Amino acid sequence: MKKENNYISTDVNHKKLIFGVVIIHICFLIIKNSGITDILKEKNIFYGVLINMIYQLTLIIMIGVAMKQYLITSFKKFKADRISVNIKRVLAGVGIAFLLSCIAGIIEMTVCSNISVPANQSNVNGYFVDYPILAVIMSVIMAPFTEEIIYRGILFRVFSKYGELCAVLSTGFLFGTMHMLSSFGNTNILLFLCQWLDYFLSGILFGFIYKKYKNIWINVSIHGTWNLIGSVMLLTKIMLTK
């Protein structure tokens, strides 16, 4: 089994930064989905984009300072593999993600008579309509990096003390739940569970990928490519409906 890089610095300040990254992530999602940011977005959707950009940049800076050596070491190992090998890994990961998404979609269509767009996705769609370039940057580059660092790079390590399978399941559960916070109380329970399942399965997949390769950049590459495909499809749909 591949050994994970020991990226947790002995520097107390760095440990505080890593802890702060997780806390800021949780607090931001709670505030974002409480309706407070919706008031600003109703005035101007750019405020929503701006808040998200500031949030992502803050996390990226904190992660860069606290986990610099881990990121550099992992990237060197990622670069050491042949490009063709990494491409195959990304394509395999995206292929499995597509299969899991199809399974979740079939279950949703079978179980739920009323199909609607998850609230999380609705917000993203609005950004793509008005600010497509910024939306792509956030969706394809920023979000995959910060989410993979938080769920696989930090929390996976925490839960792996109880076994790597526990880490995969726990981070998958948290990944799915955090993406569905905005739907709590806003939809029927069956629809909520079906939509949550899609994110949960994605989280489980990313967890197993990290368990196998122990390299965060492989996760970021697969996550980013998956989001890129979704972004292209969404932008194409927007262009065709104009």
Where are these regions (language model features)?
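Transmembrane helix-loop-helix hairpins at the membrane interface
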Residues: C102-G105, D130-K242
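Alpha-helical transmembrane segments in multi-pass membrane proteins
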Residues: K16-Y70, A119-G126, L134
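Structural signal for the C-terminal ends of transmembrane alpha-helices
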Residues: G64-S74, I209-Y213
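Juxtamembrane/transmembrane-helix boundary motifs at the membrane-water interface
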Residues: C27-N52, M109-T110, S183-L191, V232-K242
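Juxtamembrane helix-loop-helix connectors linking adjacent transmembrane helices
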Residues: E42-Y47, I72-A143, G185, L240-K242
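Alpha-helical transmembrane segments
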Residues: N13-I30, A92-A97, S170-L174
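Short, Lys/Arg-rich, polar N-terminal cytosolic tail immediately upstream
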Residues: M1-D11
